[in-house]
Amino acid sequence: MNPTKLFLVFVAFAFAIINALPVCRQGTFDPDYNGIPDYIIVGSGPGGSRAVQQCIAKGHKCTLVERGYDYFEVPYVQTPSASFLVYSSPAVRYASTVSAKNLFNLTVNAIEANVVGGASSINGLIVVITDIDNFYRELNITGWSYEELLPRYLELMTSLNRPEHTGPLDVSDTPVSDPAYQAYRNAIRQVFPNIPERLPDMNTAFANQNGTNFPGFGPPETSTKTTYMNFAGANVPIVSYRESAYMAFVHPIRNHPNFRLMTRSRVDKVVFDVCKTRARKVIVTATNYFGSQYQCELTARYGIVLAAGAIRTPQILLQSGIGPANELSALGISVVKNLTDVGRHLDDHPTIVRQYIGPIPDNYYSANINGHAYWNYQDNASVIPNWAMQIAGVPGINFKTVLSVLQIRNHVVQ
């Protein structure tokens, strides 16, 4: 080889070494940190937790990368009744969008999980089987129809109302005799006298009807694992804790030799090969226990699974060069794939939840028991017409959660 060319190759090689990021040691396997995982799963919410469980079950070495804290670093997430403590803890991050044109240039505030288990570690513990309309049967994608996926949903759960299934996720039912549910039902009947009640619970009714003719209400199942003890022939609940995705899927494999967990580690981008066809490396910004940040990289032998949620997954894709080419180029991001819909069409949650503290208005219908349920046929006519169910919290603390079914017709949402 020409000496000049040899020198240039040497310089390029040296430059690459000098600028290379260190290996993310927390995500490797061998003592010398050269043992790379077979797969990297980004995000430890329900999707990522289930993915890593299946990854280990198939005999692979798998690293789960989570931006937030380890599960037991935030003790409140284990207690079902401690939501108000969770929302003021490090398990939660608060984010705001930029002004959105389709929302009259208003911003949207979002609560994001910042702990292993993702949203399942901080949410309202309601277990809902995805509605049949969300399976996109018109796309005719093999293996993803409602009929094919419903058995998989059922196989994930262990429920008193579906004893034929024993999955890793324990769910608890809400008895029809529960005073809070009775108040809820009475309130609904006052406003919607003809709406059908779905028993023994919403999920079982949905499964029994094959997802057809489903609109209605019923007792919810909750993602709590409850231990019962028999007293005088009756099963009495003794203790209950949150059955998060972490507890159901990750905790049982926590000490498996093929499993690694990186916490406080934010994936900034996915790195593709020169042909822009394969991705086997992620760039990570990690935070140590002293609060100092550093960048590192982690390589997978076979592939990377993005399961960082409805907000952060498209963000990582965009930062990696996958998205609207003109917008990426304007930001100086090298385009890997022009996909115009990435980062758009966000559809993340079936309800709108509003919480506030204040007196109970006199014009509310109410079932007057502890855990009051209130209905107001028009919450604020000057802003938006809607139906609003309100459930008061702990007696003595007038804290109400509002679930709204919005009927929007050219009104500003505030």
Curated annotation (Swiss-Prot):
Residues making up the signal peptide according to the UniProt record: 1-20
Superkingdom of this protein's organism: Viruses
Gene Ontology terms, MF aspect: flavin adenine dinucleotide binding; oxidoreductase activity, acting on CH-OH group of donors
Keyword Signal: yes
Pfam families in alphabetical order: GMC_oxred_N
Binding site for FAD: 38-67
Keyword Flavoprotein listed: yes
Record family assignment: Belongs to the GMC oxidoreductase family.
Xref: PANTHER family: CHOLINE DEHYDROGENASE, MITOCHONDRIAL, GLUCOSE-METHANOL-CHOLINE GMC OXIDOREDUCTASE
Protein name: Putative truncated GMC-type inactive oxidoreductase R832
Species this chain originates from: Acanthamoeba polyphaga mimivirus
